[in-house]
Amino acid sequence: MTGNGNFVSDPIIAALLSEVSAKLAEIVESGTSFRIDLRRLPLPVGGTAALRDFLGNGQVEASFRGVGSCIFSETAVAGVWWGQQYNTGGDLVGEFIEIAYVPELLKCETDEIEQAMKDLGLKVREAQQIRGRGSESSSSTNRSPPSSVSNKT
């Protein structure tokens, strides 16, 4: 973790970090993820920036686009993600800490994966049919074998 830890003496910040630590222990035991909405907390002036600096930067950043967008940044603390939510105009409308192996919004739902399996299967079959039609027309012409194929007579 980086940053100046002086702000940790603030009781709200200290309680928040204690909560994050407790939720990390819970996720190891239960696998349940948690989200803390930073905009609903009475953080001191500069507290959000100081907290983000204190938690540091990890190696992963991911975005989700829907109505507006959401950016998740892994912190230097494994399992602790910094989330920022934007409206369609690009204004920051939410900021939160998510304690999770992977942020919930980034996970595929079972029904999405089931539909993706069907869609991919259909796409593969269509591609094979197109390829098969192309092979039939090219097989009627007399072509020499590729140079890597040897003819033994």
What name fits each language-model region?
Residues 1-3, 144-153:
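Eukaryotic low-complexity, non-globular regulatory regions
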Residues 37-41, 60-89:
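Short, structured protein-protein interaction patches enriched in aromatics and acidic/basic residues
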Residues 73-141, 151-152:
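Helix-rich interaction surfaces within compact, conserved domain-sized segments
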Residues 53-60:
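Short, intrinsically disordered, mixed-charge
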Residues 1-50:
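N-terminal domain-onset segments
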Residues 8, 142-143:
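Compositionally biased, intrinsically disordered/low-complexity regions enriched for serine, proline
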